């Protein structure tokens, strides 16, 4: 396994567009070539080595045999692991917006929290966040009909609003609370929320949402039977009937 370590040389007041931080882009390059990759600091193009210290193993490897370790504050670094299909990206701290955008495989691990649009339109792979995540986790970007189509996202903390909006497949698990309207326009994905949320599944046509904490259910959902899940009772609802939806919503019985 080749390990590449990347550390910020200073703090950043503006965001950095760094979609080059991915095993596909770095695995076959020398450390000097990695440092010469282009990133954007605000509206100015820079070299990766102008902003970050790049260290690690020199020998090239396949993307699947590459680990990229990001150490320090990456909360203003956007598009980490964008489009990756193999290998591992490990963020030892916080990650900026659009982390894991369009992932096709591999593992993105974040020991801190992630900003908005985590796992946007991801296809395959796995994202694990030890902290919290922002809005639009696993969602589709403006104008897109489908968000997440496959893969897994696991968040140990809480998530923001519009969790899994427009998702067409895959699964999202949030152990804490979620913001308003999780699973809005869900078209086939699976969402689990371990805490509370508000108005899940608006305009859902397909898929499943489970809420273990408290929530308010839209009146356009039809109450069905009470089911047992892992020894606990959940009220089952079907909808969203406004969209002739066939989705399933399970809410824990208090």
Locate the predicted segments by residue.
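Intrinsically disordered, low-complexity terminal regions
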Residues: 1-73, 78-79, 83, 128-130, ...
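Fold-core signature of tandem repeat domains
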Residues: 91, 95, 103, 110, ...
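Leucine-rich repeat
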Residues: 96, 115, 135-139, 179
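Surface-facing alpha-helical segments and adjacent helix-coil boundary elements at the starts of domains
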Residues: 48-49, 65-104, 109-115, 119
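Short glycine/serine- and acidic-residue-enriched loop/turn motifs that recur at repeat junctions
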Residues: 100, 119, 137-138, 164, ...
